[in-house]
C-alpha cells in the first residue's frame, strides 16, 4: 500500500500525547448549534487530522429562537411545542456532528435530562427541568463520568460570562471546571450519592481547559462591516464606532478583551464544513440572515476561532498565540508515540489513490 505524500510528511508526534495516549478533544456546549457556531471549524480541523473529537451538549435547546418557518409550523402544530423543538434540534445536531466529523456526541445525562433554561431573567430559569435549576452536583458527576470514559487531553467550553451571558453557557462553564476536578479524583462515591466517574472508570486528568471566546477586535470588525442597519445585535456598537466614540469607552456586553485570547486556530480550510453544519441547524439558522451570510463568507473571519486557556500550561506560541490546542501535549518526537495506521484501508482504491 502506498501512503500519500502529505501523510508520509506528517510527524508521528501528531498521533498521540507524550504518554502514548491517542489525542482526544472534548467540547462541552450548552445547546445544539453552539458546537458549530463557536468551535465548528476547529472541530473539523482536528477531526480531519484523525484526532478523536467528542461533544457533550447540556440541553436540547427546547427554548431557542426559531428562525425557520417550517420548524415554526412543526412546533405550533405539536401538543408540546418545546418538546417538539427539542426533538427537532436533536436531529439537527446529528446532522451537524456528521458534517464536522465529530466521533462521539451525547447529551449530558441523556437527551432531555436537563432543559434549555431560556435567556437570563425568563421564568423558565426556575423550571425544575432547566439546566440552571437542576442539581449541580448531579450534572458535575455526569460530565465527570464522560471525561473519565473519553479521556481527553483538551476540553473546550465557555468563559465565566458564558460568551454572551446565557445562563446555560455560564452553567456549562461552571460544571466543566468542577467536572474536570472531579474526574481527576481517585476512587470514592460522588457527592450526589452515585459513582461519580462511572462504574469502574479510572481517574483522568485533563491537561488543558479552554474557553471558546470572541475578542473585542473581531466584534468591532463585524459591527463596522454590518453597519447600524438591519437586524444584527451589533447595530449599537456600529453606531457608536461610526460616531467616533473611542473604542475603550464603548462597553461591549459580550466577547472578551483581546489580551485574554491565548490561542488562535486558523481553520479556514474547514470553513465549508462549518457552513454545512450550520445549514443542518435549520431551525436556528436562517440562510438569508446576516449571521449565516457573514459566517459563510471567506473573509468573514469565522474560519479563525479563538480560545482562552483556563487550566493547564500553554505550549509554544506562534505570533503571541498558541496555534494548536494540543501544544505542549503532543508527543515531541517519533520515539514518544508509535504511529498507528490501522485506520487506513488495506487495499488501495481503483486508480491507485488512497483518498
From Swiss-Prot:
InterPro entries: GlcNAc_PI_deacetylase-related, LmbE-like_dom_sf, Mycothiol_biosynthesis_MshB. Its EC number is 3.5.1.103. Zn(2+) binds at residues 31, 34, 169. It is an enzyme of class 3 (hydrolase). Coiled coil: none annotated. Pfam families: PIG-L. Its cofactor is Zn(2+). It catalyses: 1D-myo-inositol 2-acetamido-2-deoxy-alpha-D-glucopyranoside + H2O = 1D-myo-inositol 2-amino-2-deoxy-alpha-D-glucopyranoside + acetate. It comes from the Bacteria. Binds 1 zinc ion per subunit. One of its GO terms (biological process) is mycothiol biosynthetic process. Keywords: Hydrolase, Metal-binding, Zinc. One of its GO terms (molecular function) is zinc ion binding. PANTHER family: 1D-MYO-INOSITOL 2-ACETAMIDO-2-DEOXY-ALPHA-D-GLUCOPYRANOSIDE DEACETYLASE, N-ACETYLGLUCOSAMINYL-PHOSPHATIDYLINOSITOL DE-N-ACETYLASE-RELATED. Catalyzes the deacetylation of 1D-myo-inositol 2-acetamido-2-deoxy-alpha-D-glucopyranoside (GlcNAc-Ins) in the mycothiol biosynthesis pathway. Belongs to the MshB deacetylase family. This is 1D-myo-inositol 2-acetamido-2-deoxy-alpha-D-glucopyranoside deacetylase 3. It comes from Catenulispora acidiphila (strain DSM 44928 / JCM 14897 / NBRC 102108 / NRRL B-24433 / ID139908).
Amino acid at each position: 500500500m502506498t501512503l500519500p505524500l502529505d501523510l508520509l510528511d506528517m510527524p508521528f508526534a501528531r498521533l498521540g500525547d507524550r504518554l502514548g495516549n491517542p489525542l482526544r478533544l472534548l467540547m462541552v456546549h450548552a445547546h445544539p448549534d453552539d458546537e458549530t457556531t463557536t468551535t465548528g471549524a476547529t472541530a473539523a480541523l482536528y477531526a480531519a487530522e484523525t484526532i478523536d473529537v467528542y461533544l457533550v451538549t447540556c440541553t436540547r435547546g427546547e427554548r431557542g429562537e426559531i428562525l425557520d418557518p417550517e420548524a415554526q409550523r412543526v412546533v405550533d402544530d405539536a401538543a408540546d411545542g418545546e418538546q417538539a423543538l427539542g426533538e427537532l434540534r436533536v436531529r439537527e445536531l446529528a446532522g451537524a456532528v456528521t458534517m464536522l466529523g465529530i466521533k462521539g456526541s451525547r447529551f449530558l445525562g441523556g437527551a432531555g435530562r436537563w432543559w434549555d433554561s431560556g435567556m437570563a431573567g425568563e421564568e423558565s430559569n426556575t423550571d425544575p427541568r432547566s439546566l440552571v435549576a437542576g442539581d449541580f452536583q448531579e450534572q458535575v458527576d455526569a460530565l465527570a463520568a464522560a471525561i473519565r470514559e473519553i479521556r481527553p487531553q483538551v476540553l473546550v467550553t465557555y468563559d465565566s460570562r458564558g460568551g454572551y451571558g446565557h445562563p446555560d453557557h455560564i452553567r456549562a462553564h461552571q460544571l466543566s471546571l468542577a467536572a474536570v476536578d472531579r474526574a481527576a479524583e481517585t476512587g470514592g462515591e460522588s457527592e450526589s450519592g452515585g459513582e461519580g466517574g462511572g462504574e469502574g472508570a479510572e481517574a483522568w486528568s485533563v491537561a488543558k481547559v479552554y474557553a471558546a471566546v470572541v475578542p473585542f477586535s473581531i466584534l468591532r470588525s463585524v459591527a463596522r462591516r454590518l453597519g447600524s442597519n438591519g437586524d444584527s445585535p451589533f447595530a449599537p456598537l456600529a453606531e457608536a464606532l461610526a460616531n467616533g466614540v473611542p473604542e475603550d469607552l464603548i462597553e461591549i456586553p459580550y466577547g472578551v478583551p483581546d489580551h485574554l485570547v491565548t490561542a488562535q486556530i486558523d481553520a479556514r480550510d474547514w470553513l465549508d464544513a462549518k457552513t454545512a453544519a450550520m445549514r443542518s441547524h435549520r431551525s436556528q439558522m436562517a440562510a438569508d440572515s446576516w449571521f449565516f451570510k457573514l459566517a459563510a463568507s471567506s473573509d468573514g473571519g469565522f474560519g479563525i476561532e479563538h480560545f482562552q486557556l483556563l487550566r493547564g500550561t500553554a505550549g509554544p506560541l506562534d505570533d503571541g498565540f498558541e496555534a494548536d490546542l494540543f501544544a505542549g501535549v503532543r508527543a515531541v518526537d517519533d520515539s514518544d508515540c508509535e504511529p498507528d495506521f490501522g485506520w487506513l484501508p488495506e487495499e488501495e482504491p481503483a486508480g491507485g489513490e488512497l483518498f
